[in-house]
Amino acid sequence: MVLIKEFRVVLPCSVQEYQVGQLYSVAEASKNETGGGEGIEVLKNEPYENDGEKGQYTHKIYHLKSKVPAFVRMIAPEGSLVFHEKAWNAYPYCRTIVTNEYMKDDFFIKIETWHKPDLGTLENVHGLDPNTWKTVEIVHIDIADRSQVEPADYKADEDPALFHSVKTKRGPLGPNWKKELANTPDCPRMCAYKLVTIKFKWWGLQSKVENFIQKQEKRIFTNLHRQLFCWIDKWIDLTMEDIRRMEDETQKELETMRKKGSVRGTSAADA
């Protein structure tokens, strides 16, 4: 058995704008999660071509310990909380696989994302068979809804309900911003359809861990997209060449940060 959810994140930007904004935000957020021996190590970031599909391939290692719940830390052997993330970004489609060498075939997280120029109304964009699609829970993430944010994660300067973009004149996003966006044809819009499939095969812990991971994925998607919108004035003028240069610099920074200082960023909200 696997647990599958589809998260839909609507944003007031175009699919083209989002490509730069998402890469910028991931690089910045990585720095906030790295330090004290934990965090993100970038092994590869290079173009790929496979069966006619072209894009950017990344291989990252996540060194975790304090970022997993206590009930996992208690039973996990030393050195086992290291996760490999491989991503194939053939934008506007992206596929990410997370694995763990200790658990081998008993664990994976698969995130498949389609970025579409709509308001999150398309059904089964990932083309699942009807029986599988019936089991998928759809979760709508509203980046302007503070009630969807963990209290410990809230930052006023990363709140789309308060933020106004000087460069694009977008925001702040009120309670009915999606309806207003639907009635404003000249403002860009898009939706990230993120299909998350989780397998964790460990007797007695399976459903608890699978639900914990899905909860954490929602938390990550919510926080990242709130940041992405509120950082729009920092990335809206950047090109993909700028982003690749920034990623190279970030890779070096992360390596230095991970080896010193204290643990930073999100800790596990124990489920």
Curated annotation (Swiss-Prot):
GO CC terms of this entry: endoplasmic reticulum membrane; Golgi apparatus; Golgi membrane
PTM statement from Swiss-Prot or TrEMBL: Constitutive phosphorylation of Ser-262 has no effect on phospholipid transfer activity but is required for Golgi targeting.
Gene3D superfamilies the record matches: 3.30.530.20
Major subcellular site: Golgi
Compartment list: Golgi apparatus; Golgi apparatus membrane; Endoplasmic reticulum membrane
Record's keyword annotation contains Endoplasmic reticulum: yes
Annotated positions of the Phosphoserine modification: 262
Modified residues (N6-acetyllysine): 215
Pfam families listed in its UniProt record: IP_trans
Protein name: Phosphatidylinositol transfer protein beta isoform
Species lineage: Eukaryota, Metazoa, Chordata, Craniata, Vertebrata
